[in-house]
Amino acid sequence: MKTKPVGRLVVCGVGLIGGSFALALKAAGLVREVVGVGRSQASLERALALGVIDRAAADWAQALAGAEVVLLAMPVGQTEAVVKAMAPHLAPGTLVTDAGSTKRNVIEAFYLHLGGHLAHAVPGHPIAGAEKSGCEAADATLFRGRKVVLTPLPENEPGSVLRVAQLWQACGAIIREMSPQEHDRVFAAVSHLPHVLAYALVHDLAERANAEQLFEYAAGGFRDFTRIAASHPEMWRDICLVNRQAILAELDQYLSELAFIRALLLSANGPGLEEVFAKARAARMAWGERYVNDANGGGSDE
Amino acid sequence: MKTKPVGRLVVCGVGLIGGSFALALKAAGLVREVVGVGRSQASLERALALGVIDRAAADWAQALAGAEVVLLAMPVGQTEAVVKAMAPHLAPGTLVTDAGSTKRNVIEAFYLHLGGHLAHAVPGHPIAGAEKSGCEAADATLFRGRKVVLTPLPENEPGSVLRVAQLWQACGAIIREMSPQEHDRVFAAVSHLPHVLAYALVHDLAERANAEQLFEYAAGGFRDFTRIAASHPEMWRDICLVNRQAILAELDQYLSELAFIRALLLSANGPGLEEVFAKARAARMAWGERYVNDANGGGSDE
């Protein structure tokens, strides 16, 4: 069943995610007008020039006039300020959703500032992205086959949740639902912590006196392990701040794992090390076969 | 200056590295006969069938008769036993080299068992590999543009070091020299530790009650961060055991870095986190531009 087109879509934060959502709905013939709003006038002008948005709004009053759907897609640290600023201008029927990598803080902002609007404020998180950021990298096909996690509120009207789900499905995405607490714990483990660990390794090496020498001999294993250390610092600062309790819990769990491996190394426990490595390898290979078109396979190249 | 062909090359451990060395020298017209030796008869037969080796030797006496060059390319944990076993059958002029990812243990084995042969026993480490292992994955082009680190002994005859260097150069490799201590410290930092960290993360998640759920939401950042967790457990067990002191030192350094980041998270220190992330990103991007044809770029996709 095809969902009906959005008359006016407002995208706050026209970067990779917001821009791709706009382009995907345009490609599907499911949006008549896209209005961009954001803190950077320059990036709104680029989005306009690229046809990602049809119009840039000067303020929330202008942006929200006649808006049917609003997607919040700026770094998660801005959520509360943005929700607070938009709230007074929101018409009763406008559907609000977001694309933040963390959910508890988004929900807190909704409860704080959208108290009368909770029927139509549906938190979401598309598990998609690319190496690039900014609206120049926006791509109508970005969400094809990717998961979008919705964490609906008890107050949400079922029709609003369905509408958000259908719009993402029209972008090619697969919908999952979770509680916000569960969402934030799961992504702390499989996404936020790995980012922190990769940043930590590169930072550690880069600050050494012999950093030049170390980097000269780093090869393909290092390349892949640290690829996410080139991620956007502000975005990841925000994720770390808003989800810091779950990330700390995951970090502490990981430190226990490292303490265990450290003991195996200290005691030169070959069978113990091989068992850990073999279990990890089996789990990684099973994951690769099941969840990704893992063209590059797994394994070392050093 | 083209180096002269090797009359008879012996490869111990005909896997990805040993097999690729044989194929590369064959492709360059620089070897007349390749003799394989190893603990697995089945893998020697596959290497024979694939034309990676010309003959499989039943024992070291047979393998070393008339051998001009020997490459040791089995997992590093076998080095001492292999060197001990070959020593009695080694003719005075035969050149011995190796491809181990660690060097101090190889040198210890040379000093222990090749006391009269040190002029011609040259330790080396090709920084190359691929996702696959085994002689089926052997590839004549594997070493093109890759570094090979030699860690010559004071006892080495300059002509022997030059000969080893020229053979690797004929495979397309770039030669570097380092002390074995420096080699083992550098690779503990940029290769061995990242492997341990990736194994640790996957092992940690795989052992949880909700492992299925966690893996379901893992995406591209996790894929690349953990690719090396699919590496060969025996090979990495051996590397961890023989280089455990350097790896422990690197692990402890990394644990200090994580303690620092943990403190930033605990205190919700946004500027501090952003500074670490921004420094890491700058270093990772500079590395990507300088050292790799980093087609995939860096950055997050979550």
In which residue ranges do the predicted regions lie?
Chain A
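Residues at the starts of beta-strands that form the adenosine-phosphate
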Residues: R8, E33, H120, K147, ...
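Interdomain hinge/lid region at the active-site interface
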Residues: A211-A280
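NAD(P)+-binding Rossmann beta1-loop-alpha1 motif at the extreme N-terminus of oxidoreductases
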Residues: M1-G66
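Short beta->alpha hinge that forms the Motif I/post-I loop of the SAM-binding pocket
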Residues: R39, M74, A99
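Rossmann-like NAD(P)(H) cofactor-binding subdomain of soluble oxidoreductases
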Residues: K84-E136
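Internal alpha-helical scaffold of NAD(P)-dependent oxidoreductase catalytic cores
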Residues: L142-R227
